[in-house]
């Protein structure tokens, strides 16, 4: 192994060890309309609860978007530092996220308890070992 190969390997390993950082909901940017895949879910309607899904910031997978699903229906593709706000019926709902492009991650899911009284807030993140996840957050 020559010095160039060693440097490339070290760089790759250092990137894999970078965890992403939560973004406060108040500072996360709204996903652009061009990446909204189902605009009807973004409409606030009587009897529905608010769901916010945001994508962490950080070096890990920063070149890729994440596709957000609600009960199997695509909602939007969000980039790091962005959020999508949509509305679902009250009760247990399934959210999912899938890494797009060249990024690893596959499809991950989480149950959301949706209520009209408070938003259900979730984050999409990469851990320090490269694991891709969607989970509830207080940030």
Model-derived regions: residue spans:
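Sec-dependent bacterial lipoprotein signal peptides
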Residues: 1-19
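Short loop/turn and low-complexity linker motifs enriched in small/turn-promoting residues
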Residues: 18-139
